[in-house]
Amino acid sequence: NNYQILKAENPILIGSIKVIPFLIDHSAFDSYCFFIEADGKKILYTGDFRNHGRKGKLTDKITGRLSKHIDAVIIEGTNINRIQEKINTEENIENEIIEKVKNKIGINLIMLGSQNIDRIVSIYKATSKMKKILVVDIYTANILATLSKYAKIPYPSSNFKNIKVIFTQKLCRKLELEGKKDNILKFSKFKITKEEIETNKDNIMMIVKNSMLEEIGNIKGIENGTFIYSMWEGYLEKSTALLQFLERHKLEFIKIHTSGHANNNFIMKFIKEINPKMIIPIHTNYPEKFEMFGKNVKVLNDNQEIEIV
């Protein structure tokens, strides 16, 4: 039980070490970077970050506040090998969804990570502008309802009447066996049935997961609809069931995605603006790409220690 709840910019003291969490832009909700002060040294650990999401201003704010004061930055480099002049923002994603499906006939299915809250907000905004119904499963509904206590997030409720919940048998059975029936019942007022989806399929945007495909496949009339894939393309290679589902139901396959991580251009800009004395790249398959910053880059192996002087 020895834990502390993080609050943005509230310092945490661990002996003589001070850690200040700063909210930062990332696809996961409530992401933080950490400013660490110890033995007179100042270290910034970025965590996973970007600036092209709905909270991009948070990342820009950090560079303004902490620049010129960093002895070392521990920085992620997931996309350091991706050099893009222009990167999709979440606002672009929202507009692209509208452009691709506004004149389509048939159901619209979209696959993404259920904890990619920025993306769900983009989908909700697009769905609302098209006056369509957004359908989510019980798992996603519970995540949204929980997080709505901490931020202005759309969730199945009387405040967001165009969000409905599909009660898939597989997940409902699992929750009942685990004694979590309340996680199902609290969304009863916002339930949408398979029959209602069939009747209104032209007006539906449904968030789906691989575990739902078998049940979704039993909905009448989903053939020739649209399937938007809003995830990292690398997952597709292992998604045999999904590829078979798409072929079986003759769904139009559309990719609309942007990464939860900063690209090469922004990583370079970020480092130049905070101007650290030392750069320690992590979370990357291409640490050598950081060598452009010269002698102050330290590429470390696992378990290797370094002294910041």
Predicted regions and their residues:
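Active-site neighborhood of phospho(di)ester-bond hydrolases with catalytic His/Asp-centered motifs
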Residues: 24, 44-49, 73-78, 108-113, ...
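A polyampholytic, Gly/Pro-enriched intrinsically disordered region
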Residues: 21-24, 41, 155-165, 275-281
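Hard-cation-handling environments
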Residues: 82, 86-221, 282
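His/Asp/Glu-rich metal-coordinating catalytic cores
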Residues: 1-118, 122-128, 133, 150-156
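C-terminal regulatory/interaction regions
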Residues: 129, 172-309
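Gly/Ser/Thr-rich loops at beta-strand to alpha-helix junctions
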Residues: 25-29, 51, 113-120, 140-142, ...
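Short acidic-hydrophobic, aromatic-tinged amphipathic segments that line or gate anion-handling sites
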Residues: 2-8, 165-169, 298-300
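Short, conserved active-site loop motifs that form the nucleotide-linked donor/cofactor pocket
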Residues: 3, 17, 70, 163-164, ...
